[in-house]
Structures are given as C-alpha cells and as structure tokens.
Amino acid sequence: MLVIPTLATEFTAEENRPTFINILKQLSKVSYLKKIIFGLDSATDEEALELAALLRKYGIRNYIIQHNEGVGLKTLYKRLNDGGFGLDRPGKGRNMFMSFGVAQAIGAKYIGVIDADIRTFHRRQLDRLFYPVLVLNYQFSKASDLRIGDNRMYGRVKRLLLDPLLLALKRKFWESGEERFVRLIDYLLAFNYQLSGEMVFETNLLKRMHFATNWGVEIFTLIEVYRKANNIAQVQFSTRPFEHKHQPVSSDNPEGGLYKVAIDVVSTLLSTLVIEEGLEISDYFVRDITITYLNVADELIRKYCDNAAFSKLEYDRNTEEALVKGIFKNAILAAGEFLTSPHLVSDRLLHLITSDSRFDRYRDVGLIDELIAYENENTNHIFEVPQTVSWERIIMRQPDILDDIRDVIGREAAFFEEAQ
C-alpha cells in the first residue's frame, strides 16, 4: 500500500495542481498497489469530494481518502486522545501515523510513503522504492535523490546544516573515543539524502516504531530504524534531478520556514542522542559543536562552489554562507538552549546577580534562594521530541481499534461513492 500525506492546497492551488495531477497520472499505471491512502489535511467536505472526483478522473480506483477533518476521523482521533495517546496536534506527523493505522487495518504487509509535491515524479521511482522490501525482503528502504533543479543545487538543510553538523559531531566523538555515538553518526552519514520523505516499511517493523510530529520526522525515523531493523536499503529514487516545493528562508522568524525546520532537525537529532544514547550536553558542548560546525560548513561550501563551477551550475556562495551563519548556526544554538534549559538559565542568572552590586536589593529579599530552588527542581528537565506512540502499543491497549478504523473507512468510502 502507498500513503500520500496531502494538503487540500496540493490540488486546489493553481500553482500546485499540475504537480499533483502528474502524480495521479503516474500512479494510475501502477498495478501492484492494493490501496493508495490519501491522508487529507486542512480540507473541507467539498474539497474532499473534489479530491475524490479528481482521483476518478485520472483513473485511480483503489483509493482511500482519509479525511482528517471529517466526522469519522475526528471520532477516531478523539478516541485515541481520550486513551492518552496524544494525537491532538494536527500536522503531517499525525496524518501519516493515522494512515499507517488505516493501512494496518486493511491488511497491509508493506507500506510506502511519498510526498504530494514531487514535481518530477515517475512511476519507476515507486518501483525502485518498493523493490528491496517487496522482492528482496528488506525491512525498510529509503529514497536517495539528486536535489538539483533550475540549474542549481537544492537540499539546503541537508547540505548546509545536517551534513556539516553530523561531521562535526563525528569529529568530536572520534576525538573523545565515544564509539557508540560514532556508529550512529556513520549510519546517518551513509544516507545520501537523510531528509527525503520517500520510504517503504515492512509492517511488522512499522507497528513497533514511534514517529516524530515535528520537522525532525525524517531524521527521527532513521534513528528508530537504526534501533529496530536489521535489513535496511537505500535506493536511487531517480536518475534525473529531483524537484519538490522549497521552504522560504524566514530568517527573522524561528517559528516558520527554514529556521523552524532547522531547529526541529537539530533538536530532534541531539535530544535523541541525549535520551537514547546517553550523551551529556552542556553549554560548552553546544558552543564547541557550533564552532566545529562552522568550520566544516565552510569547507563543504568551498567544495560545493568548486563542484558547481565544474558542472556549470549556478551557485551563490554568499547566500549559502549567509544561511550557515545567519540561520543554521542560530538554529544549533537555539536547539542547544532547548536541550540545556531551563536549569542552566538559573545558573547564568545566579552568576550575574552575585557579581554586580546593582542586584543587592534583590538578593536581600531572597532571589538567590528562589533561583537555587528553581534550579534544583529543573535539573533533570530534558527537551523531548514531540512524537507518537507505536501502533503496537495502541493495539495492545485498545484491541478493537483496527476494527473501528475499518468501519470508519468503510463509511467514508460509501460517502464518496454516493457523491459521484
């Protein structure tokens, strides 16, 4: 089965519609998919009906529309939230997670995921993605692709943030002899494009996995696979340049664009190393890694510049350097703040108010005692990646949940059939 997380704007916005229609045309030629699940977010009932009509128009008959704003799906989300599973935050992570439940409910053995914004999609890419799992019995396959379009390099978060950060971490861990961290970093570096959203899972693996619900979902998924799978494949998704929608830079807004993506990716990576691998993070560690990151990024940018010149690609070195120093460096520092706060904040304040006489009157009324108490209360505080539980755990606690999902999907299918 195939899962496609889909926003209504993928087919209602004129600039996105041609890309989506091309995906449908290509999928109509694929014969080995039992079902194609469109996890539809941010859509009205009318837009859900529009999607159903579009699917029929372009020959997609084996579809399921998982309308997350529909009455049936809202009932399922409420049941899961009432059970304490924390699926109350809309977004791609929650959408995908429910799609995985739908796929399991109707008997999927293998579940693939692709994004709905691939401008250069071709059915052969899907064949490549499924082949290792479907034919060769791998548990997981991940797409590797060439992020070049309009005669320039894309994949900025991977090239300018993740790769140099991983190399900086490897350099630090190698020097300190911490091999367990080096093994994980080497595993992540082995993927040519760690942040691709195109993957296939064997169902027994997928049901044991947790999934992040922020922009760090891809790196979190790879680390989950590292822990829980034995046979992992990386496939060349396309021999042609791969193109999809690109995030705006949003340099002045840490809650949007590339800035937000970068913070989520770094905090997900580092917090996973803290929680699962026992990494100790301090202010010094964050500063040290940031300095090493800047050096490595500078080396890579020089290589990208040389590569672009040799390959006759457009390359704006100044823009790339500005991204590193103005966005990605700050994202690492911000992620470090998340991971070391709040107890380190009190430590800084204690140092400040005990070293300056201007704070005498505050010390006299007990501020130091309050700060020490706050520090003691929060010493063990850690940043946790927003994530789902596993479907294995949900099924264990609610054994009939898959039956309920089948019932809801059946009613939704009847609704879309009657509306023809």
Say what each PLM segment does.
Residues 121-203, 207:
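Conserved catalytic core of nucleotide-sugar-dependent glycosyltransferases
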Residues 213, 222-240:
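Catalytic donor-sugar/metal-binding loop of nucleotide-sugar-dependent glycosyltransferases
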Residues 47-106:
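Active-site-proximal specificity loops/subdomain of glycosyltransferases
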